[in-house]
């Protein structure tokens, strides 16, 4: 078996923990120079629903390996910050980066309600437990459907190697990544900070992600900063994969910034810190 490039899968699991290591670079100093790459806006369909996303391509005709990147829950175009920070890095290393916007966010804002508004409505109606149940309903339903529609678009693209499509994502996008790799045979997956804010308050979400990790159809690399909201997702989900005999890696990076929110932002503000580790895992 192989991952996304011509190198063998690691069957043994690897756990790298950096708690207590030297402090990571300051948040404002983590952006290494990356060749400028212009993003191309594209349209993809989910049944009758028209959705949009951005693609960063390497130079040349391809076909190339690709990563489908699931964004977080931020409103409007805020998630473009992650795409702009990460997409050019992949393109510079010969990978296509596809950032699809799910319904209600970014370039797909007109395609449906914003998930944050839906969760707030659930909270007003039924409290924290209702919000937790709504997270699972939406991320396993409409939003997973949007992810799989984006994957179908990638597989049809002539410049893509359909056997070399990885999936990644941060925060809610990390949750989407784990759910997606249960459904589809991606070549590899990267969950950055997925469920860190929701884990302790959402038992249904914990159960869904543990199930998905046990059933994962590709290896997963879990990473977080030491000062993220909660490190339990990485620990519990990697343990579930280990129990199921599935390949995985984990890495807990030194604190990023000073607050929990800073730590949670490592996935997009600190791409210079983790990119080489992720790229090694994918290849």
Language-model features, listed with the residues they occupy:
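Bacterial N-terminal signal peptides
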Residues: 9-20
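N-terminal cap/lid segment of alpha/beta-hydrolase-fold proteins
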Residues: 27-61
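Short substrate-entry loop that stabilizes the transition state in hydrolases
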Residues: 62-64, 72-109, 198-199, 230-231
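Alpha/beta-hydrolase
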Residues: 70, 100-102, 192, 253
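Alpha/beta-hydrolase active-site loop
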Residues: 115-157
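Primarily recognizes the serine-hydrolase "nucleophile elbow" in alpha/beta-hydrolase
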Residues: 139-215
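The feature captures the conserved acid-bearing segment of alpha/beta-hydrolase catalytic domains
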Residues: 188, 193-249
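C-terminal catalytic histidine-bearing segment of alpha/beta-hydrolase fold enzymes
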Residues: 247-283
């Amino acid at each position: 078996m192989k991952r996304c490039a011509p190198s063998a899968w690691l069957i043994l699991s690897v756990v790298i923990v950096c708690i207590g290591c030297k402090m990571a670079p300051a948040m404002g100093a983590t952006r290494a120079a990356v060749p400028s790459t212009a993003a191309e806006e594209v349209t993809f369909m989910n049944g009758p629903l028209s959705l949009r996303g951005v693609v960063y391509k390497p130079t040349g005709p391809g076909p190339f390996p690709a990563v489908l990147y699931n964004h977080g829950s931020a409103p409007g175009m805020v998630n473009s910050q992650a795409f702009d920070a990460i997409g050019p890095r992949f393109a510079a290393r010969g990978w296509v980066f596809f950032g699809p916007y799910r319904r209600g966010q970014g370039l797909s804002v007109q395609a449906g309600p914003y998930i944050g508004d839906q969760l707030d409505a659930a909270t007003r109606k039924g409290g924290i437990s209702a919000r937790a149940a709504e997270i699972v309903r939406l991320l396993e339903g409409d939003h997973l459907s949007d992810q799989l529609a984006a994957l179908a678009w990638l597989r049809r693209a002539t410049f893509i190697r359909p056997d070399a499509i990885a999936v990644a994502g941060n925060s809610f996008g990390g949750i989407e990544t784990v759910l997606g790799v249960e459904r589809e045979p991606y070549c590899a997956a990267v969950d950055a900070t997925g469920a860190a804010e929701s884990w302790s308050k959402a038992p249904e979400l914990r159960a869904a992600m543990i199930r998905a990790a046990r059933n994962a159809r590709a290896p997963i690399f879990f990473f977080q900063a030491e000062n993220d909201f909660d490190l339990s997702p990485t620990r519990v989900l990697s343990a579930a994969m280990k129990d199921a005999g599935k390949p995985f890696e984990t890495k807990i990076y030194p604190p990023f910034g000073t607050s929990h929110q800073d730590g949670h932002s490592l996935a997009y503000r600190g791409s210079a810190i983790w990119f080489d580790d992720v790229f090694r895992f994918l290849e």
